[in-house]
Amino acid sequence: MSLGAADVGAGAGPPGQHAGAVDNWPVAIIGSGVVGADLMSRIGNGDGRLRVSAMVGTNPHCDGLARAAAAGISTSPGGVDGLLIMPEFANIRLVFDTTNPGARQSNWARLADTGVRMLDLTASAIGPCCVPAVNLDAQLDAPNLSMATCSAQAAVPIVAAVRRHGVVRYAEVVSAIASQALGPAERVTLDEFAELTTTAVQELGGARRAKTLTIVNPADPPMPMRTTVFCLVDQADEVARIEADVLAVVDGVQALLPGYRLKHRVQFERLGSGNTLYIPGTGEFGGTRITVLLEITAAGGYLPACAGNVAIVTSAAKATAEAIVEHHAQTVKAEL
């Protein structure tokens, strides 16, 4: 892949101190593994709102640092401490943390007082949780944003769409992710990611209760990520409108990641006498079960097609960063 050079723009001041509206922000990526490399490729050659000025990691021999260096991007194997002493850091406006749960606290601790913004792709919950298709506008001024998990990025917009038409008494999210698309760090944090997804489905999606299941799919050749979202609602009298809203949010997420799509039409099943379900912590339920089947493919970028779990988070992070830049430009313009 070919990425253009990302040299620092002339005349840029310290982080957070630019006097005028900024059309193109220099950013840094912490973490040179698969996630960081994919994010770098999605940002591209700097002809949009973002340009990668630095990438740092801890493995000097990893592919991500080699690709960044070949693209003219400054690199360091010194991690966040290496970033802080790079000449380019003086102009960095925003940092993406793509490392792992073990490093996320220390990375933000080192950067919190520098004035840079951070988008955390490790699902750390240090900052507010962000699903750009649902709650981006409310988070644009936060110094640290935690990108929701891959399952939450896929499912929360669906639950929120159903919630517009009534109370979602229970939502269940079942994601099957290719074994080849999960690294060692992700495998040991599956339970934590499930908890974070459940919280996002409730707090951002609006479900009263929720549950998340993650299945590691060993199929070879590997399959794309597939997420099934179940919503239990008392009534679903507006079937056509619910389906239309679900289709609209799918289109919205597709704008961020073209590989996000409905696998089948939205399904509605009436549950009644002799055909009820049990909601944990609530009891017997008779109403309507809405089922949405999604497939997430890593369209474009650095990843194989099966790694939709990574692509949906890097795509969401890129879109969030671009919105932050636009929001900052509009805010500065309004103050002039």
UniProtKB/Swiss-Prot annotation:
Entry's EC annotation: 1.2.1.10
Coiled-coil region(s): none
Binding site for NAD(+): 32-35, 309
Presence of keyword NAD: yes
Highest rank taxon of the organism: Bacteria
Reaction equations catalysed: acetaldehyde + NAD(+) + CoA = acetyl-CoA + NADH + H(+)
Biological processes, Gene Ontology terms: catabolic process
Keywords, in A-Z order: Aromatic hydrocarbons catabolism, NAD, Oxidoreductase
Entry similarity comment: Belongs to the acetaldehyde dehydrogenase family.
NCBIfam families: ac_ald_DH_ac, PRK08300.1
Name of the protein described by the UniProt record: Acetaldehyde dehydrogenase 1
Species: Mycobacterium marinum (strain ATCC BAA-535 / M)
Taxonomic path: Bacteria, Bacillati, Actinomycetota, Actinomycetes, Mycobacteriales
Gene from which this protein is expressed: mhpF
